[in-house]
């Protein structure tokens, strides 16, 4: 009677093991509940690391997803702009200043402009030879900038200024403009533009085609009639390749006259045909002026014209020598100042 029955010990042992197992399970559950309650997923870890990372000023945009930085590709501008107005009545205010013209063209810098709503089909450089014509230049810029903007052109205006006392050389200045402008931009089209001619109709497109273009069909000073059938002066348009092919203008026309006919002969020599706009479109106002000192009539022009076919390969872009004094990017135009130390 003093000893426990042999079957009672296994029962108590089983009961003890049961309670021990229960306590173990409870301890495991509670330890996982109270210890490390927040499980940070990998993406959250990356976000938190980026959040606390020190970013130098000006570098915040590097956190923006690349897709948000992509610029929407613009479509090409139409061949004929919807902004054209046609014939305009030109007004020239006697007290107009360059500052006033600049205020009207806030999006122009260094004479450069491009449309924001579409991609221009051509890059156009307008080259204007100049000396002592500040008022004419102001009038031309006043009308030419909005004229070109309505045509939705990617353009730049270059004024090529001849300093010194030698006779004026329009053709050589235009060669200089072509060479210097190409150092800044690979222009598709070049407009060779007299400073005293202002276009009246913006359907007269300042672009280049398969053939050279003569844009001045008529002007007020000639009753809006063509000066003569083969006239190729005033304002002309040649592509980069066309002008290079004929070796540009001759450099030997000092004073007034002959250089535009020389260029026409070069164009014809290369079997190119000159096109013109409709007479109602190719109309210009010529701002009145007297003959400039240093731009007297070139009495040798006919002799030079007869030499063209023999000398065109060696007289032109390939032989254009000049001293470049400065290139200034003014708000309304880029001014290129040169000196010709040889010549008349």
From Swiss-Prot:
UDP-alpha-D-galactose binds at residues 129-133, 168-170, 195-196, 224, 256, 289-291. Residues 1-12 are cytoplasmic. Keywords: Disulfide bond, Glycoprotein, Glycosyltransferase, Golgi apparatus, Lipid metabolism, Manganese, Membrane, Metal-binding, Signal-anchor, Transferase, Transmembrane, Transmembrane helix. Its EC number is 2.4.1.-, 2.4.1.275, 2.4.1.90. One of its GO terms (molecular function) is N-acetyllactosamine synthase activity. CDD domains: b4GalT. GO terms for cellular component: Golgi cisterna membrane; Golgi membrane. Residues 39-344 are lumenal. Its main location: Golgi. It is an enzyme of class 2 (transferase). Belongs to the glycosyltransferase 7 family. This is Beta-1,4-galactosyltransferase 4. It comes from Cricetulus griseus.
């Amino acid at each position: 009677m003093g000893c426990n029955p042999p079957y009672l010990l296994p029962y108590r042992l089983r009961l003890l093991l049961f309670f021990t197992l229960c306590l173990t399970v409870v301890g495991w559950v509670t330890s996982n509940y109270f210890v490390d309650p927040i499980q940070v997923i990998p993406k959250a870890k990356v976000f938190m690391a980026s959040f606390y990372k020190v970013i130098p000023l000006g570098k915040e945009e590097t956190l923006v997803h690349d897709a948000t930085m992509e610029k929407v590709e613009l479509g090409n501008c139409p061949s004929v702009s919807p902004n054209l107005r046609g014939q305009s009545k030109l007004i020239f205010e006697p007290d107009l200043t360059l500052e006033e013209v600049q205020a009207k063209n806030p999006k122009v810098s260094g004479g450069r402009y491009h449309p924001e709503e579409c991609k221009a089909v051509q890059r156009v450089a307008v080259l204007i030879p100049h000396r002592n014509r500040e008022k004419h230049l102001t009038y031309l810029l006043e009308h030419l900038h909005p004229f070109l903007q309505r045509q939705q052109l990617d353009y730049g205006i270059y004024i090529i200024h001849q300093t010194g006392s030698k006779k004026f050389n329009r053709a050589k200045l235009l060669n200089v403009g072509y060479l210097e402008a190409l150092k800044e931009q690979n222009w598709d089209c070049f407009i060779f533009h007299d400073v005293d001619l202002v276009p009246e109709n913006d359907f007269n497109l300042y672009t280049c085609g398969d053939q050279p273009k003569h844009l001045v069909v008529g002007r007020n000073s000639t009753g809006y009639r063509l000066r003569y059938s083969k006239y190729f002066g005033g304002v002309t348009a040649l592509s980069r390749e066309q002008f290079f092919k004929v070796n540009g203008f001759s450099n030997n026309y000092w004073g007034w006259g002959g250089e535009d006919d020389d260029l026409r002969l070069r164009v014809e020599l290369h079997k190119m045909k000159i096109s013109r706009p409709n007479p109602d479109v190719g109309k210009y106002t010529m701002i009145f002026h007297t003959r400039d000192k240093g731009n007297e009539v070139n009495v040798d022009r006919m002799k030079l014209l007869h030499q063209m076919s023999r000398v065109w390969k060696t007289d032109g872009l390939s032989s254009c020598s000049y001293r470049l004094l400065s290139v200034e990017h003014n708000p309304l135009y880029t001014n290129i100042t040169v000196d010709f130390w040889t010549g008349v």
